[in-house]
């Protein structure tokens, strides 16, 4: 568990004096960091008793072709680019906005694999 609330320190190094302590709504978790590989998912209990599917490894993506309106399940071959972090390409991490190479061609991921549990992508022209 990770606390994601505001720091108790000011930019000057002094302390903020708050009227409340840490709240349960401010906790978070470590990122799932979805890789290319044999499918592995983890179900996580979230706030309010709901569930979130975390994709740890995925090998298929649902790719849509905007020109023809066709959508197909295709195999992910490689991660070609990722504007979030250049190291994500080396580590083959799947994140929203990453450019992947599929059997249909190059595509941009539009879903959040570590939050949704699936990779949805749109084919690049």
UniProtKB/Swiss-Prot annotation:
Pfam families: Ribosomal_S8e (PF01201)
Alphabetic keyword roster: Ribonucleoprotein, Ribosomal protein
Keyword match Ribonucleoprotein: yes
Protein biosynthesis is among the record's keywords: no
Residue ranges, annotated region (Disordered): 1-35
Residue ranges the record marks as coiled coil: none
Biological processes annotated in GO: translation
GO molecular function: structural constituent of ribosome
GO cellular component, one term: ribonucleoprotein complex
Tree of life domain: Archaea
NCBIfam families given in the database record: eS8 (TIGR00307)
Quaternary assembly: Part of the 30S ribosomal subunit.
Entry's family note: Belongs to the eukaryotic ribosomal protein eS8 family.
Record-given protein name: Small ribosomal subunit protein eS8
Organism in which the protein naturally occurs: Methanoculleus marisnigri (strain ATCC 35101 / DSM 1498 / JR1)
Lineage: Archaea, Methanobacteriati, Methanobacteriota, Stenosarchaea group, Methanomicrobia
Gene, per the UniProt record: rps8e
